[in-house]
Amino acid sequence: MKIYLSPSTQENNIGKGEYGTEEKRMNQLTDIIEVQLKRYGHEIFRNTPTMTLKQAVADSNKHNPDIHVAIHSNASTGKARGAVVFCYKFGGEGERLARAIYNELEKVTPTKDLGVRESNNHFGIGKPLYETAYTHAPAALIEVDFHDNPEGAKWILENMNEIATAIVTG
């Protein structure tokens, strides 16, 4: 299977404690995911930290993968916790991918998670999450937990291998 991995490129999105940036940590997580997927014989393509969202989506579409997986950590008020996985709309391959990943991720997270959600109107009517809307391949965008919550940031840092394995299994 051909898989496009797209870790966050948000270099200014800082987490709590020792977390550092979302870009650094999600690229670190994606490094682990990539190694695991290659062990299963999958062909992996991936964005680079210097790419914009539009460039990453264009690169994904150029490689024509079977699936596109965006890997992020979330931010809110500093109090929220839990994983959430987005697909563009319910009813298609993107939803199946998102649910498969979520079902495995939910097994390793220490809190009540936030489920699988549609992203077609994420930023308002007709304003979707870019990576779920404009990739040609079925796409899922994962938010593994909240990096602006001290416990969430710590959990991500201490459980990279478990999180990666859950994503790969999904």
Predicted regions and their residues:
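Surface-exposed patches in mature extracellular/periplasmic domains of secreted proteins
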Residues: 43-50, 111-119
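Long, well-ordered alpha-helical scaffolding segments within enzyme catalytic domains
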Residues: 28-38, 95-110, 152-170
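Loop/turn elements at helix/coil->beta-strand transitions in domains of secreted/extracellular proteins
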Residues: 1-2, 37-43, 63-68, 108-112, ...
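Short glycine-/small-residue-rich flexible loop motifs, especially phosphate/cofactor-binding loops
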Residues: 34, 57, 102, 129, ...
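N-terminal catalytic cores of peptidoglycan-degrading enzymes
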Residues: 53-59, 63, 67-70, 77-88, ...
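Active-site-adjacent mobile loop/cap segments within catalytic or ligand-binding domains
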Residues: 4-6, 11-13, 63, 68-77, ...
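A short, glycine/acidic-enriched catalytic loop
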Residues: 12-21, 75-104, 108
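Active-site histidine-acidic residue metal-binding/catalytic motifs
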Residues: 1-57, 63
